[in-house]
């Protein structure tokens, strides 16, 4: 420890006198500097309260002690002398300086800026602008011809301050810069076929309108090969505080490789033909919604921590998707074909339970929910892997056969009309539980939010276990038959 009242300022206990330090050799000078560094680090590890440290530093400054500045550990950190800084930052092997803080680039987008410049300067076979194609297709004959392809249209590189709607109407082929951040502050109406390449750019939805992108009915325009719909690809959408719908489409829409993060409402609402492929949905309320008479195609998409993944009221095709930590992966009200998907239920954390009033009864939304309908057929449900999920099956026409589905730790709720119309012959059924709903207990109703937007009272169902009544006898029906394997190539 240092003496309480040192007579020589700046020289700690154990050091030589100041006159002798000036005449010492280089090795002794370096040893003294290293000793000073160890003493400084030792003083910074002293466990002092903030009050004691403040009083001690004030008293030390008044008594002639060397001042010290407070460090992150709560103690005093001695200011380094220039000689000590050179010793600590000099490498012993290479001789170069080390431990020196270098200024970081404030933007941090050097790589993305280089990528943007590389994409903008790349040579492409682009020869004609969109307005030139429009001017050539004025008459009735040329408007039906496909004279140009997408590769021949010139690209308009959109800046963050540009108007999206005007650029789409005038250029049709749009590209975003990956080093820029775009913000949507008003509704964008799209009335012509277009091709928008995002290049991984981030688009923040910041508007009070009901829909951010409204894909309206398209007029008669000259055809371009490869641009027959409204196409958006490789765009990252964020909805910080946005409570509306991102895409409302009543025309043909293609979303390719986009990601949606943190939307409190519907991401894609389809009233026409919509194709969603290779997209990712993170922490969204409703990812995709196919309304009545819509044709929704969802392929190779990922749903994570969403409340409702796919809402289907019309026609839907769901292929090769993955869902995890999603309360309801698909709610089938219309006709659907669900094949080759991997559905993982929620973890130990219990999600918020919503209702659905479709089918005449208010039931808790299951991970896979099939609504009962007196005239609709069962959905095609094949080759799916379901783990730690719940299924709700309502009554429909025909027989429901989840062919070659792996149901591991799955609880299936069967409505009374669906009990005799479900066959679990061709599935992996070791850890499946089948329950039949007998009636609804109206003594303890609970009011919950519904997927329709309102709130309803939910009555507790009274169920009975019917697993062994529906499970086939595997000693009679062997698993070596043609149901679980075939010599031919399985096709989608």
Swiss-Prot record:
| Outcome (variant: residue 42 to R) | In strain: Grider
Q: Kinase: is it a keyword of this entry?
A: no
Result, substituting residue 259 to R? In strain: Grider
Q: Which InterPro entries match?
A: Adeno_E1B_55K_N (IPR006717), Adeno_E1B_55kDa (IPR002612), Pectin_lyase_fold/virulence (IPR011050)
The consequence of residue 52 to Y is: In strain: Grider
* Keyword field: Early protein, Host cytoplasm, Host nucleus, Host-virus interaction, Modulation of host cell apoptosis by virus, Phosphoprotein
Q: GO MF terms on file?
A: ubiquitin-like ligase-substrate adaptor activity
Q: Where is this region: Disordered?
A: 22-112
Question: GO CC terms for this protein?
Answer: host cell cytoplasm; host cell nucleus
**Where found in the cell?**
Host nucleus; Host cytoplasm
- Similarity comment: Belongs to the adenoviridae E1B 55 kDa protein family.
Please describe the quaternary structure of this protein.
Interacts with host PML-4 and PML-5; this interaction promotes efficient subnuclear targeting of E1B-55K to PML nuclear bodies. Interacts with E4-ORF3 protein. Interacts with E4-ORF6 protein.
UniProt note: domains: Contains a PML interaction motif that allows the subnuclear PML localization.
Q: What is this protein called?
A: E1B 55 kDa protein
């Amino acid at each position: 420890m240092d003496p309480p009242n040192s007579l020589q300022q700046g020289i700690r206990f154990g050091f030589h006198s100041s006159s002798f330090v000036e005449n010492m050799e280089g090795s002794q000078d370096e040893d003294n500097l290293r000793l000073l560094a160890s003493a400084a680090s030792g003083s910074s590890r002293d466990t002092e309260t903030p009050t004691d440290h403040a009083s001690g530093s004030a008293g030390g400054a008044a008594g002639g002690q060397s001042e010290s500045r407070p460090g992150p550990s709560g103690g005093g950190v001695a200011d380094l002398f220039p000689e000590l800084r050179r010793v600590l930052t000099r490498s012993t092997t290479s001789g170069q300086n080390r431990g020196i803080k270098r200024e970081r680039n404030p933007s941090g987008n050097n790589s993305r800026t280089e990528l943007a410049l590389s994409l903008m300067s790349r040579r492409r076979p682009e020869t004609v602008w969109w307005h030139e194609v429009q001017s050539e297709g004025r008459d009735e004959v040329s408007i039906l011809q496909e004279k140009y392809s997408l590769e021949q249209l010139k690209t308009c590189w959109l800046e963050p301050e540009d108007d999206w709607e005007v650029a789409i109407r005038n250029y049709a082929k749009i590209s975003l810069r990956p080093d820029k951040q775009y913000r949507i502050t008003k509704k964008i109406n799209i009335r012509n076929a277009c091709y928008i390449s995002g290049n991984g750019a981030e688009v923040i939805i910041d508007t009070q309108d009901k829909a951010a992108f409204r894909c309206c009915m398209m007029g008669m325009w000259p055809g371009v090969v490869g641009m027959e719909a409204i196409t958006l690809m490789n765009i990252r959408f964020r909805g910080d505080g946005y409570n509306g719908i991102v895409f409302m489409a009543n025309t043909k829409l293609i979303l390719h490789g986009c990601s949606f993060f943190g939307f409190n409402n519907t991401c894609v609402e389809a009233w026409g033909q919509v194709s969603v492929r290779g997209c990712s949905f993170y922490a969204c309320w409703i990812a995709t919604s196919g309304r009545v008479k819509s044709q929704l195609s969802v392929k190779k998409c990922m749903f994570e921590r969403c409340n409702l993944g796919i809402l289907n009221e019309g026609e839907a095709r769901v292929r090769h998707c993955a869902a995890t930590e999603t309360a309801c992966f698909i709610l089938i009200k219309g006709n659907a074909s669900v094949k080759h998907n991997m559905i993982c239920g929620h973890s130990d954390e219990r999600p918020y339970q919503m209702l659905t009033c479709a089918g005449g009864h208010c039931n808790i939304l299951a991970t896979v929910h099939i609504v009962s309908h007196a005239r609709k057929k069962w959905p095609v449900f094949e080759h799916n892997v379901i783990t730690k999920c719940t299924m709700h099956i309502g009554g429909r026409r025909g027989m429901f056969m989840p062919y070659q589905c792996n149901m591991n730790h799955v609880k299936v709720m069967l409505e009374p009309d669906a009990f005799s119309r479900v066959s679990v012959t061709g599935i992996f059924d070791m850890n499946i539980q089948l329950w039949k709903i007998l009636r609804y207990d109206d003594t303890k109703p609970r009011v919950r939010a519904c997927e329709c937007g309102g709130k309803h009272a939910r009555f507790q169902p009274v169920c009975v276990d019917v697993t062994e009544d529906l499970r086939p006898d595997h000693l009679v029906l062997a698993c070596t038959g043609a149901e679980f394997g075939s010599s031919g190539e399985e096709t989608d």
